[in-house]
Amino acid sequence: MRRKLVAGNWKMNGSLAANALLLAEIKAEFGNPACDVAVCVPAPYLAQCLSLLSDSTIALGAQDVSSHDSGAYTGEVSTAMLLEFACRYVIVGHSERRAYFGETNELVAQKTVRALSAGLMPIVCVGETLEQREAGQTDEVVGRQIDAVLSSIAENDLAKIVVAYEPVWAIGTGKTATPEMAQEVHVMLRRRLHAKNAQAATEVRILYGGSMKPDNAKELLAMPDIDGGLIGGAALKAADFLAIIRAA
């Protein structure tokens, strides 16, 4: 049985003071959850959060990584740098990276390969826009996104990735896919994974990343192919994040 994963994506939020308060509040009520938990924080705060989480089972993650190893790539962060801060996870291909920074399926695949080669666990994000969903293109668009990654990685690396389905139309809009709508896409993704490596496909965790909140987490997480959540806004509020963790 797949152990669920709840990963908080802080996006471009936080401060030294706010981070310390948030993590202190989470740790105070954390207990011994039945799921894995991670926080993916802005790169400048990795050192601070590594220190704050040193006595916790909460894993540390980054929000992006360079497809390059090192060199003259101003502003980029390499896998080696992330490893120095004990990162376990790294988000690749988030819808905001695709929409605002022009990241292509090919670049996302390259970043995934780079992360895997360094021993990081990439959280590979896929998802469709409202326009694409209304045009009946969900399977086509999301399928292309995941296939670009699957065709680039070795068969025996499949079990080392996490997939996150984030319907773009449900992020920050207040709209949420019904559990059944989300499950339908997760099943499609599982089938794609199965075609790559049948055994590994049963082990890969597929997270839901479309505005999971305390009031919908339990229903979403009850779906057989929803193996956790990639949490945005709710990860910035200790009570909300803890409620989702408990629902998992």
UniProtKB/Swiss-Prot annotation:
**Which cell locations does it reside in?**
Cytoplasm
Q: Which GO terms describe its cellular component?
A: cytosol
Functional pathway: Carbohydrate biosynthesis; gluconeogenesis; Carbohydrate degradation; glycolysis; D-glyceraldehyde 3-phosphate from glycerone phosphate: step 1/1
Please indicate if the UniProt record lists RNA-binding as a keyword. Answer: no
Where are the membrane-spanning stretches?
none
Q: Which Gene3D superfamilies match?
A: Aldolase class I
CDD domains, per the entry? TIM
Its principal location? Answer: cytoplasm
Give the EC number(s) listed in the UniProt record.
Answer: 5.3.1.1
What catalytic activity does the UniProt entry give for this protein?
A: D-glyceraldehyde 3-phosphate = dihydroxyacetone phosphate
This entry's Gene Ontology molecular function terms read: triose-phosphate isomerase activity
- Which of UniProt's keywords are assigned here? Cytoplasm, Gluconeogenesis, Glycolysis, Isomerase
Q: How does it assemble?
A: Homodimer.
Q: What is this protein called?
A: Triosephosphate isomerase
| Source organism | Herminiimonas arsenicoxydans
Tell me the lineage of the source organism. Answer: Bacteria, Pseudomonadati, Pseudomonadota, Betaproteobacteria, Burkholderiales
The encoding gene is tpiA
